[in-house]
């Protein structure tokens, strides 16, 4: 709630005007004495408009540092059908940093294509964001489904994501964002967004909305994109133009209206995925609906011939690069530092190229860099402790009082 500004102090001009009027009354009355005006009591400084619970950002509270390899394709996700031997394979991979965000819409496209073959037994390869949503949507379409996967959550790449609604994050290069692609992408994003609304408020909060604060030391600062002289291709940015009605309007806060001293803030709201309970919910629903999960590892498409199902959905994410020899996949490294949860923290932060998310399954700190080329074409998966501590210490700066 906005507090009214403090009253102006009892200044010299006002005091003199009051004294002059009192003397005039005394002269006219000839007998009345006028008491001097009382000194005003000092008013306390107004409270900040924003009251945010303090974050205990300290490197000794880090519990885990993990690295995720995002599967970027310059032309966008692969959703075509390929026939290999006697198998019809529907591909559903290559979503960059948008996997969880687009999973329901993208998997709906893959499932529609898979069901056109008329088979009632369908296999899914992979048990991450795309694999689980493909399996559930196949069941809803009437299929009997088995998921074959080398690893299960939480030991899949999808479980190592930051957990933010980011449907156009490294989705493709700008030159490949044709009108047809934009239409498909918007459809996937909207279908996913609407599905997520049905998951709000469930036990464990698998999906929830949070307020996020972009913090800067100067007014009007924003995350920088590639420099004008940068000759590298630009990543497509689609959300503002095509999903503008789903994006709440931002709200600015100047110095003195928040706990972060003389900095500038802009508040926005977006969805966040608490990935551990969310993945558990998807797996539980899949198994409860009669789905089967088998541990299996495939090294080439030829090995898929051993499966009894004639129709398969390939949801192997970055794994498709090795399994199907898809060299169009470029790895994008993303590291997060996890920290002991603080249930009272219900807001996110972005400051100096570092993102903080208040996930209930562990607070998340991530260096995201100045632009989307940060971590591009880097397939290293060894955690970098120095980068993790940099992320935590950067956010910790906001809570220093001196």
What spans do the regions from the language model cover?
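N-terminal secretory signal peptides
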Residues: 1-11, 21
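Flavin (FAD/FMN) cofactor-binding and adjacent substrate-gating region
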Residues: 18-20, 59, 65-86, 158-160, ...
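Active-site substrate-recognition segment that forms the wall
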Residues: 38-85, 94-100, 108, 128-143, ...
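Short beta-strand to alpha-helix junction loop
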Residues: 98-102, 180-188, 266-281, 382-386
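Glycine-rich active-site loop/strand segments that organize a redox cofactor
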Residues: 152-188, 242-249, 255-256
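A conserved short coil-to-beta-strand element within the FAD-binding core of flavoproteins
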Residues: 292-305
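Short hydrophobic core segments
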Residues: 310-316
């Amino acid at each position: 709630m906005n507090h009214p500004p403090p009253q102006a102090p009892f200044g010299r001009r006002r005091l003199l005007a009051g004294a002059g009027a009192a003397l005039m009354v005394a002269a006219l009355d000839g007998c009345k004495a006028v008491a001097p005006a009382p000194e005003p009591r000092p008013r306390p400084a107004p409270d900040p408009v924003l009251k945010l619970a303090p974050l205990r950002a300290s490197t000794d509270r880090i519990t885990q540092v993990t690295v995720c390899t995002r599967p970027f394709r310059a032309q966008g996700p692969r959703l075509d059908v390929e026939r290999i031997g006697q198998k019809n394979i529907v591909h559903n991979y290559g979503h960059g940093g948008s996997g969880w965000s687009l999973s329901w819409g993208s998997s709906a496209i893959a499932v529609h294509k898979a069901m056109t073959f008329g088979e009632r037994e369908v296999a899914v390869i992979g048990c991450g964001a795309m694999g689980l949503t493909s399996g559930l949507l196949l069941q809803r379409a009437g299929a009997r489904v088995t998921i074959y996967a080398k690893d299960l959550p939480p030991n899949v790449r999808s479980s190592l994501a930051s957990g933010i609604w980011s449907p156009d994050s490294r989705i493709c290069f700008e030159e490949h964002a044709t009108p047809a692609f934009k239409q498909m992408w918007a459809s996937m994003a909207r279908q996913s967004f609407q599905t997520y609304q049905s998951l709000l408020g469930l036990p464990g909060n698998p999906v929830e909305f949070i307020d996020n604060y972009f913090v800067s030391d100067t007014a009007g600062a924003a995350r920088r994109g590639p420099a004008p002289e940068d000759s590298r291709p630009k990543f497509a940015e689609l959300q503002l133009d095509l999903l503008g009605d789903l994006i709440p309007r931002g709200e600015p806060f100047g110095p003195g209206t928040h706990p972060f001293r003389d900095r500038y803030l802009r508040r926005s709201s977006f969805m966040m995925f608490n990935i551990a309970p969310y993945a558990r919910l998807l797996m539980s629903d899949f198994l409860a609906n009669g789905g089967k999960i088998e541990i299996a590892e495939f090294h080439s498409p030829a090995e898929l011939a051993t499966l009894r199902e004639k129709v398969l959905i390939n949801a192997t994410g970055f794994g498709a690069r090795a399994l199907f020899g898809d060299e169009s996949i470029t790895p994008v490294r993303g590291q997060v530092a996890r920290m002991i949860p603080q249930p009272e923290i219900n807001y996110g932060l972005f400051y100096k190229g570092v993102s903080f998310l208040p996930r209930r399954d562990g607070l998340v700190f991530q260096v995201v860099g100045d632009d989307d080329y940060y971590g591009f074409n880097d397939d290293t998966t060894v955690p970098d402790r120095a980068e993790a501590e940099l992320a935590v210490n950067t956010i910790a700066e906001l809570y220093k009082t001196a």
